[in-house]
Amino acid sequence: MEPVTNATVYVVDDDADVRDALAWLLRSRRLYSESFASAEDFLKMVEERALPRQPQCLLLDVRMTGMTGLALFDLLKQRDGFIQTVPVIFLTGHADVPTAVQTVKQGAFDFCEKPFSDNVLVDRIEQALQQSAVYLEETAHRHALLSRLADLTERENGVMKLVVEGVPNKLIADQLDISVRTVEVHRARVFDKMQVKSAVELANVLRAHGQLPQ
């Protein structure tokens, strides 16, 4: 697994010793980190600034004074795509392991029981950052696809729908009451705008992003 570059690891723990130890560990593995002493401080940061479009993950203590890690996680889940962009790894004591298992079922990436092995934790962090990177890439591809679809004219959309259904040019021309040559022109424009070379490739791209015409 290739290490993820330009990544950020957020640490939320009310124990200063834990924050310092994690900051040192992450620095030693050449991972950039930002630490927060409370869930409230992290939530304030999230609300006040846009998160960078780069791989990120969150190390979150389960039990903290004030807002707990569980309460923060519930709030973050309500933000569209947040826990996919910033996978959450819970840091938990032995007594909280059953609770941590439940959070994984609810969308957390993983949990790590204290005291944790440095290598095990860093390995999980790297996996979370990989997942974040994949999600960001897929999201970027989806946005680019939607932008290309929005650039199609109404006629091009009509031709595209029939093309991905496998309808031959002659039948498309008959259905739309246009010439075969006009169909060929629109078909070529659709392929060009959608950056594909065949009807099969076009259908696969649309299907992969849930945009296949009904």
Tell what function each PLM region has.
Residues 37-38, 68-74, 198:
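Acidic catalytic/metal-coordinating carboxylates
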Residues 35-57:
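Acidic, metal-coordinating helix/loop segments flanking the phosphotransfer/catalytic sites
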Residues 188-214:
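Basic, Lys/Arg-enriched C-terminal extension of HTH/homeodomain DNA-binding domains
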Residues 19, 60, 65-68, 75, ...:
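The feature encodes the CheY-like receiver
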Residues 70-84, 102:
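Short amphipathic alpha-helix used as the core "switch/output" element in two-component signaling
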Residues 96-98, 112-125, 171, 175:
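C-terminal output helix
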Residues 2, 7, 15-36:
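Two-component/phosphorelay signaling modules centered on CheY-like receiver
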